[in-house]
Amino acid sequence: MKKTIRITVLTALLLTLSLASAGTMAGAKTKNGFTYKITKNQVKIVSCSKNQKRIVIPNKIAGKKVTSLGANVWKKSSKVQTVVLPKYLKTIEKKQADYAWGNIVKKKNIFSTPFTGCGKLKNIKVAKGNKYFCSAKGVLYTKNKKTLLVYPAGRTQKSYTIQGKTTQIGEAAFEYAKYLQKISYGKKLFYISDGAFFASGLRSVELAKNISNVGLYAFAYSTKLQKVTLGDKVEQINTPFIGCTNLKQFQADKKEIGYYAVNDVLYYKDKKHI
């Protein structure tokens, strides 16, 4: 019987799925290009009209601590390359889109994040003293580096090595990273979240070592992806390769419990075609 993993998201207190309606802007104020709302003496940034290479989000606005970053802060930004997150930031929202099949085939991303529209973003930095997040050479992680949260889409390097402590890749973490061709990771990584590599530039993927769960549409529309290798720990994959039009080859470890490959076609062990 194929096993199913139930994962408790380690960053539930940090990454809130925003299901808010269009009424989000009600009661908002604007100062120095930042539109914000104050709730219980804490500031949430809901949008930013600044379109410049470097943007520093202030630690405080109107004397209140900036603790939250909304899912649509930059819907589209053609210039921003560096963002500095504030000292008191606790929450980075990700708005879950409609998973309906019609939206997926139209190549609509399944999450909106504060950085989704920042195609030239290369570095995310964190103000000194922040207790919840850290930056590893411009890539955003939780403070303990257990979860990789955001890999800036505008980085031009062809390969990236995930921190050795990291156990999971967050939702939409590598979305639109079109220059990225290869990803490497340590033995502790076991979970790849929904939409993690949506529309990325990856050429090949090795789901080996300790990876056991691959989220919904994790590699969707990575149109340059050609080869996928499954290791002996993979227990659950959730339609991760929709829109991968150049995917030609599947390989599965002979000892792998849940899947096997014949002539580059992936099957469940019960011989039902995936």
Over which residues does each language-model region extend?
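Conserved, function-critical positions that sit in or immediately flank catalytic
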Residues: 241
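Bacterial N-terminal signal peptides that target proteins for export
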Residues: 1-12
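Structural signature of tandem-repeat unit edges
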Residues: 33-41, 50-68, 78-94, 98-111, ...
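Sec-dependent signal peptide cleavage junction
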Residues: 19-32
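Conserved functional micro-motifs across diverse proteins
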Residues: 44-45
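Bacterial N-terminal signal peptides
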Residues: 11-20
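Acidic, Ser/Thr
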Residues: 48, 72-75
